């Protein structure tokens, strides 16, 4: 279990005891959701039932990436996908390599090396070993990086919880993040949106993204997303990529539904 690996069992047990005390029910059964269950529940909560068995879900977190898919056309087996890389861990590894040169140019050089290493040693193997390429027509990506990229590539889609993107669109965004960050200013990005209410919402969304992520962390998250997407971008077969804006609530909603059913 992930908590055991991180030596957090005592912390979790204390949290459960505190919860029982607060609700005045010392014998209440409290289930701990492990990484396998969380990834499975995320799939059930995020991916529409019509696309359940041909969609590979990937959640890019701050310290790691996880996800998976149902390989046999039923809910009995869920194949887990895991990477020990996330937006923050990529950024931290890059900054460590920068040493005393904190310039954007050096950050970009070191980021390229970190991402290249992650791709060659982890990402390619994780995708290939999952067997997801042949079985998945759709690649859905959730997490903070996906939320950020969705709002920056398609600010006009304010009411869409799921945003379709192409590899080229995300690649173009990365180039802007490095070479022309001013072009991603909220008012500039939203200027082509004609309806004022939608334009104001788009500006609000972009400001929220840039409040959470600075330029360098956006480069790290977008770069990691690109490396993952690259494994599914082929001249011979087209995969559909989707970015999920509110993926964090997915596994929770599925967990609640499952609990009610049981």
Protein language model features and the residues they cover:
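Helical "lid/coupling" subdomains associated with nucleotide-phosphate turnover
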Residues: 3-13, 17-54, 69-71, 77-262
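Short glycine-aspartate micro-motif
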Residues: 55-59
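Acidic, divalent-metal-coordinating active-site segment for phosphoryl/phosphodiester hydrolysis
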Residues: 63-67
